Amino acid sequence: AAGCETTLLIRKDRVLSGWDRRAATTLTRELKRHGLTIVTRTHVTQVDTGANLGATVHYTRDGEDGDHTVYGQIVLAAIGRDPITDAGWFSSSGIARDDHGLIVTDQLGRTSVPGIWALGDVTPGHALAHRAFEQGITVAEAIAGLDPKPVDDATIPQVVFSSPEAACVGLTLDQASARDDLVEVSETVYPMMGNARMLMSGSGGSISLVSGASVADPDTPVVLGAHIIGPIASDLIAEAEQLIGNRVPLHDAARLIHPHPTFSEALGETLLKADGRPLNTR
């Protein structure tokens, strides 16, 4: 959308509706700063295309009367995908599906029919390529008679390649707070403008880290979730994934040194702040 007037129609009440609310607010601010028009709580009712280039999109808004329209030379519909598992031969195969038509499997990809395996977008969970890759490895090793570990959905990062990028992995503050097996749950927020490389880029963003300890080990807090808005967030999230997946104690994670001046320093300073030792921020 660079250099174009862009309108974003969203069905929910905010962008990134299933993500951390603070991250969603930060991304919304940055998108608007780039000139995007964001309209929430919308329902597209019709798209009119004519002989000329472009289309007129008709939509309604929750709580408002009447029909709204917006014209665009290019219209992109990004509303998700449904599995194609309703064919007659599939129904007669005996393979179990859930209420959404997704194939039900165990942790290793086995379906309800012996010898048939399933992975990727046709199974429940996030429809992400890197998740499917890992599922493929698990299925192949299981078929080969090895002893693979099941895919841990809690450590699968999600990325939105917007400008700036958005990335998250693990739990949000609300999700962690609702868990009975976690204690001392807290959220640490780091404004990316405190990072030297961010100042050079002229961009904006934030990092939110959710930390807490298990009931079984209440004196050892770990990182439970990370939510990043900013340049190369898609790369920064990989370090957070390692911390979460390997349950690195927060105090140890905060001791890791990041090169200067890099965007990765922002994550390092967020860890320091979460550990009670803030450096360039309160």
Predicted regions and their residues:
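FAD-site-proximal beta/loop scaffold in flavoenzymes
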Residues: 69-143
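Hydrophobic alpha-helical segments, especially N-terminal targeting/anchoring helices
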Residues: 9, 97, 105, 210-217
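Rossmann-like dinucleotide-binding cores of NAD(P)H-dependent redox enzymes
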Residues: 1-51, 56-59, 66, 125-133, ...
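Flexible, glycine-rich terminal cap/loop adjacent to redox cofactors
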Residues: 161-172, 177-282
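Short acidic, glycine-rich loop/turn motifs
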Residues: 59-64, 211-215
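Glycine/Thr-rich phosphate-binding loops of Rossmann-like dinucleotide-binding domains
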Residues: 16, 84-87, 99, 126, ...
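A short alpha-helix-loop-beta-strand transition element characteristic
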Residues: 96-97, 146-155, 181-188
